Amino acid sequence: MKPSLSVVLPAKNEQGNIRPLIEEIFSALNQHTTFEIVLTDDGSDDQTGQEAIDTAKRLGCQLKVLRHPYSCGQSTAVHTAIRHADGEYIATLDADGQNDPADVVAMLEKAKQVRNPHVCVAGYRNKRKDTPWVRTQSKIANRVRQFFLDDGVPDSGCGLKVFRRETFLLLPYFDHMHRFLPALIRRMNGEIVIHPVNHRDRGAGVSKYNVWNRLWVGIVDLFGVMWLRRRTRWPVVEVTHNDQ
């Protein structure tokens, strides 16, 4: 039987974080829904993938591990995982342990309550556990993005999101697309729901982001998304008759 939910983890060199994260995912979801974990090992040179396999076997947790031979970036890792996922719904989490899997339960319920099939429940880290410099970078990036896209999302950098797999597969794929999921889903007449989430200190390892790939690279993609939104329009369709 296919799971209702696929928990997607893009991971690069997250040995030491994966074991406790999978344990938390299992604890949070095991009594609430059928689920699988789909991890993309994005060119790690540590034991990230094996740590995930060992932990899932011990727990009896359904797991898929996919591997890129070299690092392709977070968006590609997410895209790879979702293409191989079996769940109707997708929950994306950062693999560093800063997202709290306990938030997924409420976010999934919110997604199921929305009648619009193209829904995205986006996490909002209102009490971030990052350095002041990182928080400043994110605030600038969010304000710039909000000014140009007006997507109604206060925290586009939050990796914790829930949406339908079929919705994601309708989106155009490009590098760094994970930053713009709400804007892309809204473009197809989707509905965005903001959900406050817990944010925690990183357990091990170091962040893969800096001022270059957090802000300036994102600005280039921002103008690409603006162009895409203006060039394409999804019509609102009302079914007036269906014999099926």
Describe these PLM feature segments.
Residues 1-132, 139, 166, 170, ...:
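Structured catalytic core of nucleotide-sugar glycosyltransferases
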Residues 1-4, 143, 150, 174-244:
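Hydrophobic helical membrane-anchoring modules
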Residues 60, 137-139, 143, 148-149, ...:
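Long helical/loop segments within the catalytic core of UDP-sugar-dependent glycosyltransferases
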Residues 114, 136-140, 215-219:
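Hydrophobic/aromatic residues within well-ordered alpha-helical segments
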Residues 125-132, 145-161, 178, 187:
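A recurrent flexible, glycine/aromatic-enriched loop bordering the glycosyltransferase active site
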Residues 132-135, 207:
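Short aromatic-enriched loop/helix-cap "lid" or pocket-rim segments at secondary-structure transitions
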Residues 158, 169-176:
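Conserved nucleotide-sugar donor-binding catalytic segment
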